[in-house]
Amino acid sequence: SYLDGLRQAVDLRADGTSLLVLFLGSTLGNFEPDRAVEFLSDIRQIMLPGDVFYVSTDLQKETSRVIAAYDDSIGATAAFNLNLLARINRELGADFVLSQFAHEARYDSRAHRIEMHLRSRANQTVAIGKDFKCELREGETIWTESSYKFRCEDISRLARRTGFVCEVQWVDQEWPFAQSLLRAV
């Protein structure tokens, strides 16, 4: 796991050196808020005071921009989402018919999160392996992923709550995205 790899890096570092840990992309947004706190707290427990955690986060923006990014015109996100069913078919012996599902991106403005769903185009029964069957009604969805969007002050607050201080943030204003340098205290 990521934390196991971090523990190994800490064990290998030379005495007296600081550690720089990268968590790029916007993966932190894929954690439920309580899990994000737990994850950063776990990282902080592994790091020493003065070590640096560099994290990327997608920032809050207009709903239309978020939806456009996750329901893109070339269908890349839809293909990625449908690939989850293809993998379940391949790896778990399921019989999802991919053409019977449509990709949907929904933005929950209260939670500041985008949700990926696969909507059933028909009433259907799907077998997963030999022992499990799932009944889906037309219009029913499978919620496959969430991605929370942050404000810069959310990251600073999260840092303080988990034993870090946010020293600096770099923000791309064109497509609001932040790189934050958090120092373990």
Can you say where each PLM-predicted feature lies in the sequence?
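S-adenosyl-L-methionine
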Residues: 1-15
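Substrate-binding/catalytic lobe of Class I Rossmann-like enzymes that use SAM or dcSAM, i.e.
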Residues: 59, 65-164
